[in-house]
From Swiss-Prot:
Pfam families: GatB_N, GatB_Yqey. Gene3D superfamilies: 1.10.10.410, GatB domain, N-terminal subdomain. GO terms for molecular function: asparaginyl-tRNA synthase (glutamine-hydrolyzing) activity; ATP binding; glutaminyl-tRNA synthase (glutamine-hydrolyzing) activity. SMART domains: GatB_Yqey. It comes from the Bacteria. Allows the formation of correctly charged Asn-tRNA(Asn) or Gln-tRNA(Gln) through the transamidation of misacylated Asp-tRNA(Asn) or Glu-tRNA(Gln) in organisms which lack either or both of asparaginyl-tRNA or glutaminyl-tRNA synthetases. The reaction takes place in the presence of glutamine and ATP through an activated phospho-Asp-tRNA(Asn) or phospho-Glu-tRNA(Gln). Keywords: ATP-binding, Ligase, Nucleotide-binding, Protein biosynthesis. This is Aspartyl/glutamyl-tRNA(Asn/Gln) amidotransferase subunit B. It catalyses: L-glutamyl-tRNA(Gln) + L-glutamine + ATP + H2O = L-glutaminyl-tRNA(Gln) + L-glutamate + ADP + phosphate + H(+); L-aspartyl-tRNA(Asn) + L-glutamine + ATP + H2O = L-asparaginyl-tRNA(Asn) + L-glutamate + ADP + phosphate + 2 H(+). SUPFAM superfamilies: GatB/YqeY motif, Glutamine synthetase/guanido kinase.
Length: 476
């Protein structure tokens, strides 16, 4: 019997607001414990929430960016549960009337096939506090309590852990590019839970699902889903009964561990939040928000392929971050040579950034400077090899290519007469070149070219050197 996995993801993203969802406390990350709090986010008696309009706006913006239908009349609800990091003993969230429904994300599989992953709903809610486990006991920090979130719930359309990673990667790039969330997994502003079940391949009914928490990286997501698939297959194969449960990923031991039996919706006793008014969203406001959405990464990638003729792979890599996409876009327009711009950014510039642990926004030279480097190489002022050295100086000093070329005397030698003299000198000193060439070993010409380039310290035009070496060898 062959099994397949059925996977759905629930992704929580903290919204880019200055204040919390129901009060004026700051959302700044990293403050001293329990300093970004007030009676409202601590749930003290008599305090009343007031919805931050910016939260609703960003929720709608996320829905539009993810191809969702927007709910025109909605409400907030109470989700009742007890946990030490939930100060009110309930969370204000959305149940029956989420702000967005029925969206989708298209992912491109390794085969080149485009697969559509449905989005069931997006709702806005407040975050809980944070528990800190120590040897002395468990401490609680309420700074995060009340920080605004959206929860993006996918449909169970994902079939492999690799598809889950592609989906989450694209979701993160959209939310980040649209300035909805900074999506920093290391700070907890993007968190992902996975629901996974198995079934016999080719059948329709869903199996018994487990929810997996604590997947705080893309690698953890893929490893946890792979482990859970194997665990469930082994259990079913051995005749064991699966149960609906919540598990957490144990990074140290590379396995999932049972936390509790999975709750059902009625366990939370949802009911409308009476302290907040009904949400009314007009068509005019939706269009205003739609107009604030920038060109999204996948749209940029499509444009780079159509407008610049880039391969899909190049376009994908260049749009992994907005900064890199914008840098390339400007350089491509200024240089008129998109492929050269792509090669420099994906090649030598990325290598230098990796070596120095910097980002493209930290570069000391502008897209205009890179376009100038492409131009001087194309014009024959310097060779590609010298261009790599010039780039290293640009990276270190921030000077323009022409300034570096002038200061270091790097202009390419295009004087055919002078180069021909050097070619003959090299051939005279290395008679074996002629002998081997005449016997059919034409690759020996590369040695002669290399010797000429060595004599000129790399400044002779390699195209001219190649031509003259061939001419002079043929004469002898």
């Amino acid at each position: 019997m062959e099994f397949e996995s059925v996977i759905g993801l629930e992704v929580h993203a903290e919204l880019l607001t200055n204040t919390k969802i129901y009060c004026g406390c700051t959302t700044e990350f990293g403050g001293k414990p329990n300093t970004h709090v007030c009676p409202v986010c601590l749930g003290l008696p008599g305090s009343l929430p007031q919805l931050n309009k910016r939260v609703l706006e960003l929720g709608i913006k996320a829905g539009l960016a993810l191809n969702c239908e927007i709910t025109k009349v909605g409400r907030m609800d109470r989700k009742n549960y007890f946990y030490p990091d939930c100060p009110k003993n309930y969370q204000i969230t959305q149940d029956e009337l989420p702000i967005c429904r029925n969206g989708y994300i298209d992912i491109e599989l390794e085969s080149g096939e485009v697969k559509r992953i449905g989005i069931e709903r997006i709702h806005i809610e407040e975050d809980a506090g944070k528990l800190l486990h120590t040897k002395r006991g468990t401490l609680v920090d309420f700074n995060r309590a009340g920080v605004p979130l959206i929860e993006v719930v996918s449909k169970p359309d994902i079939r492999t852990p690799e598809e889950a990673t592609l989906y989450l990667t694209k979701l993160r790039s959209i939310l980040s590019s649209a300035q909805i969330s900074d999506c920093k997994m290391e700070e907890g502003s993007l968190r992902c839970d996975g629901n996974i079940s198995i079934r016999e391949r080719g059948t329709e009914p869903f199996g018994i699902r487990s929810e997996i928490k604590n997947m705080n990286s893309f690698k953890a997501l893929e490893k946890a889903l792979n482990y859970e698939f194997d665990r469930q297959v082994e259990a079913v194969t051995n005749g064991e009964a699966l149960s609906v449960e919540t598990r957490r990923w144990d990074e140290t031991n590379n396995k999932t561990i049972v936390m509790r039996s999975k709750e059902q919706a009625n366990d939370y006793r949802y009911f409308p939040e009476g302290d907040l008014v009904t949400l009314n969203v007009s068509d005019e406001w939706i269009e205003e928000i739609r107009n604030t959405i920038p060109e999204l990464p996948y749209q940029k990638a499509d444009r780079f392929v159509k407008e610049y003729g880039l391969p899909k792979y190049d376009a994908h890599v260049l749009t992994l971050t907005d900064s890199m996409a914008d840098y390339f876009d400007e350089c491509a327009k200024l240089s008129g040579d998109p492929k050269a711009a792509s090669n420099w950014i994906m090649g030598d510039i990325s290598r230098l950034m990796k070596e120095e642990s910097t980002w493209i926004e930290d570069l000391k030279f502008s897209p205009k400077d890179l376009a100038e480097l492409i131009e001087v190489i194309k014009e024959g002022t310097i060779s590609s090899a010298i261009g790599k050295k010039v780039l290293e100086d640009m990276f270190a000093e921030g000077k323009s290519p022409k300034t570096i070329i002038d200061e270091k005397g790097l202009k390419q030698n295009n004087d055919e007469g002078a180069i021909r003299q050097l070619v003959n000198k090299v051939l005279d000193e290395n008679p074996q070149v002629i002998e081997q060439y005449k016997s059919g070993r034409t690759r020996i010409l590369g040695f002669a070219v290399g010797q000429v380039m060595k004599e000129t310290k790399g400044q002779a035009n390699p195209g001219i050197v190649n031509k003259l070496v061939t001419e002079e060898v043929e004469k002898r």
